């Protein structure tokens, strides 16, 4: 009975929730029905609190639907059910998996991550930046899932999300999260061997090992770490020997229950020049996108950065900067640094007029690059239609969806009002523009393809 009940709940929740959310929060749960009490076991307190806060109503509604008058009492616990009595085992799937199923991957060869002794004879270069942690990472809708996944990995390395693959454009916080995970793991286990590096460093180390006839030492070094954090994995493209060695390193680490975290500027399957067998393995754990920050997050980033520098930044000034610079966090912080430097040099107060002057060239370039005309041309080219189609009255999906996307882009990337955007799209009403923006926002939550289109277009228009 309990097996059928929880499987029914899983099937419905997978239909109702975005794939990433289902894989990250629901799949790891184990269930047991005993004495009219349904116990759900979460791998750690973080998952338990998140599920109870975000999905309790969904689960209760399904229990009421499936059980009628005999609804069991729902109880949450941290831990796992003893194997002999376990009802549903957690299944590790990619965030983009379309159906439940066991992922084909090697079983860990060591039972507990915590019980592995440190290898004192090897000298490790951690390279983890202690300045980057979860506390100073500004969370928003665009990066919420990525931060949550990274936090879980830091709390439970070598667990359900192995490997963790983070992808998104430049300057969105992927590297910050890598370092935050590294710091989190080492805070929990000070003697952990955590190694952070750019993918090019892996290539350089391998080349040096080949030159010095030290390839066995190279293998031993990388295969004995507790956690390997590699940035910009796309730079492995077309480096066949490096890919071959990383393939075997990857397998060895997973078999040893050692944590792997990778970042890239694109979704794993879209990385050109990387072998399919590697791209397949990249998706064995959890794949999460980081998108450009929305307005509220950009404002929060500016305010936090100013606070770290003991600078009083008026809210209207932060909003002014955030509304005009939209591409990534790095650009925002660079602009704020310039404003702060100018204020220190001149002794002037930071006002909107002062920011206009300090960032004159940057703002002028941004306004020149991102216009509604430019957006229309870029979107039309991306979807292989004509600009005239976007302005027409045609309602076919092949035209209507790109038109909605272009309107959403115009609202996101320009300072034009909704009526002005509507006028630029064939004299449409502002309510049509508002509907388009809300529709695209909804589809970004439901469709991986729409989310990718949005991110690709933002990246193109903001570069």
Swiss-Prot record:
GO terms of molecular function: ATP binding; ATP hydrolysis activity; DNA replication origin binding; lipid binding
Annotated compartments: Cytoplasm
Descriptive protein name: Chromosomal replication initiator protein DnaA
A GO-annotated cellular component: plasma membrane
Organism (species): Erwinia tasmaniensis (strain DSM 17950 / CFBP 7177 / CIP 109463 / NCPPB 4357 / Et1/99)
HAMAP family: DnaA_bact
Region called Domain III, AAA+ region, residue ranges: 127-343
Record-linked Gene3D superfamilies: 1.10.1750.10, 1.10.8.60, 3.30.300.180, P-loop containing nucleotide triphosphate hydrolases
Gene transcribed to yield this protein: dnaA
């Amino acid at each position: 009975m309990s097996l059928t009940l929880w499987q029914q709940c899983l099937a419905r929740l997978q239909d109702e929730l975005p794939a990433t959310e289902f894989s990250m929060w629901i799949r790891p749960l184990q269930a047991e029905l005993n004495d009219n009490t349904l116990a759900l076991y979460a791998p750690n307190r973080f998952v338990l609190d998140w599920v109870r806060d975000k999905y309790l109503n969904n689960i209760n509604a399904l229990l009421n639907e499936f059980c009628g008058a005999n609804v069991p009492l729902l109880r949450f616990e941290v831990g796992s059910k003893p194997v002999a009595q376990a009802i549903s085992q957690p299944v590790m799937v990619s965030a983009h998996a379309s159906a439940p199923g066991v992922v084909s991957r090697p079983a860990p060869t060591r039972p507990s991550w915590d019980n592995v002794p440190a290898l004192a004879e090897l000298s490790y270069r951690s390279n983890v930046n202690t300045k980057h942690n979860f506390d100073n990472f500004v969370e928003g809708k665009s990066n919420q899932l990525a931060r949550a996944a990274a936090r879980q990995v830091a709390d439970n390395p070598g667990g359900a999300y192995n490997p963790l693959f983070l992808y998104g454009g430049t300057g969105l916080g992927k590297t910050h999260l890598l370092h935050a995970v590294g710091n989190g793991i080492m805070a929990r286990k000070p003697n952990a061997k955590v190694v952070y590096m750019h993918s090019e460093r892996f290539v350089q180390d391998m080349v040096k090992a080949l030159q010095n006839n030290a390839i066995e030492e190279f293998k031993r070094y990388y295969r004995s770490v507790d956690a390997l954090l590699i940035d910009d994995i796309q730079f492995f493209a077309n480096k066949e020997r490096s890919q071959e060695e990383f393939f075997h390193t990857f397998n060895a680490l997973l078999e040893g229950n050692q944590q792997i975290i990778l970042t890239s500027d694109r979704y794993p399957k879209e990385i050109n020049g990387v072998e399919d067998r590697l791209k397949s393995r990249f998706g064995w754990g959890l794949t999460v996108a980081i998108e450009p920050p929305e307005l509220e997050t950009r404002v929060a980033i500016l305010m936090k950065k100013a606070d770290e520098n003991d600078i009083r930044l008026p809210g209207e000034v932060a909003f002014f900067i955030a509304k005009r610079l939209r591409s990534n966090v790095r650009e925002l912080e660079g602009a704020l640094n310039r404003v702060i430097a100018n204020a220190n040099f001149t002794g002037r107060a930071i006002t909107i007029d002062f920011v206009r002057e300090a960032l004159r060239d940057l703002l002028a370039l941004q306004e020149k690059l991102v216009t509604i005309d430019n957006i229309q041309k870029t979107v039309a080219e991306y979807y292989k239609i004509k600009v005239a189609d976007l302005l027409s009255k045609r309602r076919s999906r092949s035209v209507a969806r790109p038109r909605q996307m272009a309107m959403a882009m115009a609202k996101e990337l320009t300072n034009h009002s909704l009526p002005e955007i509507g006028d630029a799209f064939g004299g449409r009403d502002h309510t049509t523009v508002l509907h388009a923006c809300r529709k695209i926002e909804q589809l970004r939550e439901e469709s991986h393809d729409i989310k990718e289109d949005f991110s690709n277009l933002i990246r193109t228009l903001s570069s």
